[in-house]
Amino acid sequence: MSRISIEEVKHVAHLARLAITDEEAAMFTEQLDSIISFAEELNEVDTENVKPTTHVLQMKNIMREDVPDKGLPVEDVVKNAPDHKDGYIRVPSILD
């Protein structure tokens, strides 16, 4: 029994604005099903004596101090934009 249906794959593709064929949907359904099966196998692993961790490695990200600085002049920023108005960059609408 498949853990994910072709309809669910097509729905997710639609939400991501991806056009996929029926053959691709079937292929992705098989691939996602095998990924989900593998993830379910992890639930069977005995982790009784494993202490919880948030990072596998002991490395840490060391960030520099965030120092506010003066930005670029608006004129310099908008001169490279293909379309701008009143100091704002105009972009095509992506929402219906």
Swiss-Prot record:
Q: GO biological process annotations for this chain's record?
A: glutaminyl-tRNAGln biosynthesis via transamidation; regulation of translational fidelity; translation
Coiled-coil regions listed: none
Q: Does the keyword ATP-binding apply?
A: yes
- Taxonomically, the superkingdom here is Bacteria
Any one GO MF term held by the record is:
ATP binding
Which class of enzymes does this protein belong to?
A: ligase
Could you tell me what reaction this enzyme catalyses? L-glutamyl-tRNA(Gln) + L-glutamine + ATP + H2O = L-glutaminyl-tRNA(Gln) + L-glutamate + ADP + phosphate + H(+); L-aspartyl-tRNA(Asn) + L-glutamine + ATP + H2O = L-asparaginyl-tRNA(Asn) + L-glutamate + ADP + phosphate + 2 H(+)
Protein keywords = ATP-binding, Ligase, Nucleotide-binding, Protein biosynthesis
Which EC number(s) are documented for this chain?
A: 6.3.5.-
Task: Report the InterPro entries cross-referenced here.
Answer: Asp/Glu-ADT_sf_sub_c, GatC
Q: What family name appears in the similarity comment?
A: Belongs to the GatC family.
Q: How does it assemble?
A: Heterotrimer of A, B and C subunits.
Role according to the record: Allows the formation of correctly charged Asn-tRNA(Asn) or Gln-tRNA(Gln) through the transamidation of misacylated Asp-tRNA(Asn) or Glu-tRNA(Gln) in organisms which lack either or both of asparaginyl-tRNA or glutaminyl-tRNA synthetases. The reaction takes place in the presence of glutamine and ATP through an activated phospho-Asp-tRNA(Asn) or phospho-Glu-tRNA(Gln).
For this entry, the protein name equals Aspartyl/glutamyl-tRNA(Asn/Gln) amidotransferase subunit C
Organism equals Bacillus licheniformis (strain ATCC 14580 / DSM 13 / JCM 2505 / CCUG 7422 / NBRC 12200 / NCIMB 9375 / NCTC 10341 / NRRL NRS-1264 / Gibson 46)
